[in-house]
């Protein structure tokens, strides 16, 4: 079983300027990471954290859909042990009734293709460090579509399949590939959802624990734990319940 302790390791987090991503940066520092590359399209909100940890936090501007920026960040971060693919987006809107392809394409570009670009760029880097780990922040909606977010669900389903494919392909280089499937988390993206929400910190804590134990599929909050339990009992019933949420 592949495992990895964060202490003295180098971590790169995408979408780290707020929410779950920022919690990953803070938790990695708390657990003794040697260095954290905190990346986002705008890293301004992390300036104080970087100033307080000048030897351990490196801020890098990154749009994961921009191949040139991905390549530049990979060139600047050749010492990474753990890649956390956290950057994501949701546009909402029904499929037929909305009749608007643009937000669905945006979701797929960021949540699937952007994640893939980062994995391709950093797989050789973590290999050179002994295998390392790639962590993909996905969603329970990638396991069964939610009718109020069909494009987001489809993009996260693609991310789920990508994670499985990466796990198989990178096993020979001893890279631990983890899929994380949160339910509603207390972030800006989920603020409109009428559910109890777990904290971003709890997601980061669960993921770093999973790295240490080699857990490949992480359900980091009570909602996601119960959701996957019901999915395993009766997937069709869950599908119908999710469809009623439109």
Predicted regions and their residues:
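Conserved glycine-rich cofactor-binding loop
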Residues: 17-18
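Active-site helix of classical SDR
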Residues: 119, 155
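Conserved glycine-rich Rossmann-like NAD(P)H-binding loop of the short-chain dehydrogenase/reductase
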Residues: 29-48
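Conserved mid-core segment of classical short-chain dehydrogenase/reductases
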Residues: 90-105, 148-151
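Residue(s) in the substrate-gating loop at a strand-loop-helix junction
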Residues: 139
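Rossmann-fold cofactor-recognition segment
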Residues: 53-67
């Amino acid at each position: 079983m592949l495992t990895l302790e964060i202490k003295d390791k180098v971590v790169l987090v995408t979408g780290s300027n707020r929410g779950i991503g920022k919690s990953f940066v803070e938790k990695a520092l708390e657990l003794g990471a040697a260095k954290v590359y905190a990346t986002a399209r705008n890293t301004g909100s992390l300036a104080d954290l970087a100033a307080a940890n000048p030897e351990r936090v490196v801020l890098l501007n990154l749009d994961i859909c921009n191949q040139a920026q991905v390549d530049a960040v990979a060139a600047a971060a050749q010492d990474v042990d753990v890649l956390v693919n956290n950057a994501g987006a949701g546009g909402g809107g029904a499929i037929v009734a909305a009749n608007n392809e643009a937000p669905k394409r945006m979701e797929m570009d960021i949540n699937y293709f952007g994640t893939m670009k980062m994995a391709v760029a950093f797989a050789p880097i973590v290999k050179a460090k002994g295998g390392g780990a790639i962590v993909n922040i996905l969603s329970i909606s990638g396991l069964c579509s939610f009718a109020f977010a069909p494009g987001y669900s489809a993009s996260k389903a693609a991310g789920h399949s990508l994670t499985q494919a990466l796990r198989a392909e990178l096993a020979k280089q001893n890279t631990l590939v983890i899929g994380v499937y949160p339910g509603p988390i207390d972030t800006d993206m989920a603020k409109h959802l009428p559910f109890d929400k777990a904290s971003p910190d709890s997601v980061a804590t669960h993921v770093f624990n999973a790295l240490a134990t080699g857990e490949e599929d992480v359900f980091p909050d009570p909602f996601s734990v119960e959701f996957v339990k019901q999915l395993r009992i009766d997937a069709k019933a869950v599908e119908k319940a999710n469809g009623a949420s439109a």
